[in-house]
């Protein structure tokens, strides 16, 4: 029986060159905390100067917060929130990859509410409080095609002292405005292009398998899987094509919409445990490492849906039995991972040991248990351990 809720309040301005509209579109405030990464890429590429100039053109004052790490951490969220309050900022603008925009959302919530951001986390050691006020408005300007955070309310932050990487979001953390300009993505290096692109792929594939899915998320998920399968290898080989970058930017946004209308599943929970304990591990890389044994399990129990994904990726399944049709997804995934140069990734290269696996499995279920609830397979702790063991090298 068809039963769903469709809610998507974000205004999305999409297209090459459309960043210029930041200088004239209506903004949700008059003073922005501009959140960027600590790595300096937004300054080196000139993206920050361009955004600051456009905001000034629009009569908006700015304060810069530039401490965000690839796996963003609680201390910086609380620090950014304190700065926003002290400077009287009335909205937060995230410029950069998913980590930066996620941080902007968390800072926006913490700036509007008392205490620590972690007081409002609903699992693990979180305080499980309800926010007293909605988050400050958020503007998202992504410079990578990966998380799709410009099209969903979710934010993922790590508490370092407890090795917990936990998601949060409500209606107030949907961006009020997102500007997706593929021109900002042309400078992204091949390895980052590959890892962020695979993150977008898994958002879409997981949303298609999730028990929270709905008709609109299915359509968007298959669109994203098709585009990423076709264009991500091209972008890794030559990232200068604006047309290719545009297709990937749309795929990432479409996958982000899937996260709003459906949900990721426990594949993401397993990865969050990995990168919570090993923050140098890029999120997309961790997902790739876990993906083949994880989706092999999904294919055994959800062969029809996995077969749909395989066909969308270009696999010929005609004449196969249903079980083999489902497992064709694993074949297609292995090909895509190799095509984007990520088939050599190893957990051990990031300091992960086999001895950690039971603790990682527990962490995944304790901190991101909500995604297990929408996974179409009942993955108990022994099954999670088995996936980690098979993925380990």
List each model region and its residues.
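Carboxylate- and glycine-rich phosphate/diphosphate-binding segment that chelates Mg2+/Mn2+
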Residues: 154-262
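Flexible, glycine/charged-enriched surface loops at secondary-structure junctions
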Residues: 211-220, 235-247, 262-267, 281-284, ...
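C-terminal catalytic subdomain
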Residues: 262-329, 334
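C-terminal charged capping/lid subdomain of soluble metabolic enzymes
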Residues: 306, 313, 317-393
């Amino acid at each position: 029986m068809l039963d769903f809720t469709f809610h998507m309040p974000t205004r999305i301005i999409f297209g090459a060159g459309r960043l210029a509209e930041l200088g004239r579109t209506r903004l949700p405030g008059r003073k922005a905390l501009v959140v960027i990464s600590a790595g300096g890429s937004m300054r080196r590429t000139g993206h920050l100067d361009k955004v600051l100039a456009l905001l000034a053109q629009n009569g908006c004052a700015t304060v810069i917060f530039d401490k965000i790490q690839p796996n963003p951490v609680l201390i910086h969220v609380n620090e950014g929130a304190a700065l926003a309050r002290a400077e009287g900022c009335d909205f937060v603008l995230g410029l950069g990859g998913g980590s930066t925009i996620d941080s902007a959302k968390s800072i926006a919530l913490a700036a509007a509410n008392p205490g620590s951001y972690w007081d409002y986390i609903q699992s693990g050691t979180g305080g499980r409080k309800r926010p007293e006020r909605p988050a400050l408005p958020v503007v998202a300007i992504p410079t990578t095609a990966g998380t799709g955070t410009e099209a969903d309310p979710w934010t993922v932050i790590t508490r370092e002292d407890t090795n917990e990487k936990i998601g949060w979001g409500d209606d107030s953390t949907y961006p009020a405005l997102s500007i997706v300009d593929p021109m900002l993505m042309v400078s992204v290096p091949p390895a980052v292009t590959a890892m962020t692109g695979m993150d977008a792929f898994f958002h879409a594939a997981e949303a298609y398998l999730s028990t929270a899915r709905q008709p609109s998320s299915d359509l968007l998920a298959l669109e994203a899987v098709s585009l990423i399968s076709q264009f991500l290898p091209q972008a890794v080989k030559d990232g200068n094509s604006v047309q290719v970058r545009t297709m990937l930017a749309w795929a990432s946004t479409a996958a982000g919409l899937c996260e709003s209308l459906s949900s990721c599943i426990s594949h993401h929970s397993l990865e969050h445990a990995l990168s919570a304990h090993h923050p140098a591990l890029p999120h997309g890389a961790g997902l790739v490492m876990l993906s083949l044994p994880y989706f092999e399990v999904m294919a055994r129990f959800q062969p029809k849906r996995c077969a749909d994904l395989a066909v969308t990726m270009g696999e010929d399944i005609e004449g196969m039995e249903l079980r083999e049709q489902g497992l064709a997804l694993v074949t297609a995934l292995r090909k895509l991972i190799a095509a984007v140069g990520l088939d050599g990734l190893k957990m051990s290269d990031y300091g992960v040991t086999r001895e950690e696996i039971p603790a990682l499995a527990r962490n995944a279920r304790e901190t991101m248990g909500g995604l297990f609830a929408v996974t179409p397979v009942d993955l108990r702790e022994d099954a999670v351990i088995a996936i980690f063991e098979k993925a380990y090298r």
